[in-house]
Structure formats: C-alpha cells, structure tokens
Design a protein with these regions (language model features):
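Catalytic cores of DNA base-excision repair glycosylases
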Residues: 2-209
Length: 209
C-alpha cells in the first residue's frame, strides 16, 4: 500500500503542481466564510458571490456586527442562505470576542465555531497553518479514494481516519486539494475520462480489479 500511495501522490503532483484551494480570499476569516458558503454549492458560484460580500463587509468587525438579513441577500444564490448567513455572522463574532480576531489553529477550537465541521476545520488548518495530517474529505476525495482502493465507504469521518493512516502527514492537505482538481477536470462522477487519467493504473474502475 505504501508504494501505491507514493505513486498516486507523485502522479497527482506531476499533473497538478499547484495544489491550491479554488476559493478566492484575501484574509484568513474570509476563507472560513467562503468554505461555509461552498457547502452544497460550487466553488465557482462562491467566487462570484464573495467579491461583493467582502467589499460590503471589509473587516471582521463589520461581519460580526452585520445584519443577518442583509448578509442573506448577498449569499442567497449559494443556497441554504439563511443558515449560512447566520453562521457567518455568529462565527465572525466568536472570532472577534473569543479568539482575538484570528481563526484558531486547533481542531477543538475550530469546531466550536458555528457552521464549522471537520471538513472545514481540516481545510483551514491545512491552508492557513500548514498543519500536517489535515485531511479534507469532500465528495471528490471520498469517491476517488474509494475507486483507488485507498478508502472504503462514504462516511467522511471514517474516510478521513482511513486516509490519515496511510497518507504522509506532510502530503495530506495537498493530496486532498489535488483530488478535488482531478475530480473536476478528469474523474467526473457521471462521465469519467479514464482514457486521460493519470491515476488509471491504480483505479478499480479502469483495471476491473
């Protein structure tokens, strides 16, 4: 398994050298907000919404004091806008009042924030702090890792645990970002382009194993 994992990591690194989060942001708390908006929504849609949102509320204080109903108007097109708007305002208020205005750097602290689950927390830890072992289990990651035989099942917490056991900690965050890029560019759920997939030699769908 160790050799297989190393080969998959190398193939993804060669294909996607820039393992960057697709969400656009300038400040750490803006990434937290963008990730919350991305739930059940495309990153592309979020990136259309956030410029106006961040311009209207240019500081953490502005978000913390924002009228939730007004925020709803800005994020409406991202879906589940009432919950998302409320979470954003409450989370920013908690950052200001309890965390010194900074996105905290531990899983325990992050999970206290409204609207922040393990997926979001792992992404923030990996992208903001470069924390080793940060495994972001989104739908692309779960689906492709099942095809590659690196994980089994669809439960994000269980897949996260399985991947953490086999991925080198320093590679885990970039690995997950690259799987998202690969899922969008090549390994689409409905119509995967197996003929141009750099992971085909390791994939159950392609090899039939």
């Amino acid at each position: 398994m160790e050799e297989k994992v190393a080969a998959i990591i190398a193939a993804l690194r060669e294909r996607y050298p820039d393992a960057l989060c697709a969400l656009h942001y300038g400040k750490d708390y803006e990434l937290m907000i963008a990730v919350r908006l991305s739930a059940q929504c495309t990153d592309a849609r979020v990136n259309l919404v956030t410029p106006a949102l961040f311009a209207r509320y240019p500081t953490l204080d502005a978000f913390a004091e924002a009228d939730v109903a007004e925020v709803e108007g800005y994020v409406h097109s991202c879906g589940f806008y009432k919950h998302k708007a409320e979470d954003i305002v409450l989370a920013c208020r908690m950052l200001r009042d309890e965390y010194g205005g900074k996105v905290p750097g531990t899983m325990e602290q992050l999970l206290r924030l409204p609207g922040v689950g393990r997926k979001t927390a792992n992404l923030l830890l990996g992208d903001i702090y470069g924390t080793p072992g940060s495994v972001v289990c989104d739908t692309h990651c779960i689906r492709i890792c099942n095809l590659l035989g690196l994980a089994s099942g669809k439960d994000p917490a269980k897949v996260e645990q399985q991947l953490r056991a086999i991925l080198p900690p320093e590679e885990s965050s970039d690995f997950c970002h690259r799987l998202v890029l690969h899922g969008r560019a090549v390994c689409a759920a409905r119509k995967p382009a197996c003929d141009r997939c750099c992971l085909a030699p390791y994939c159950k769908s392609f090899t039939g194993e």
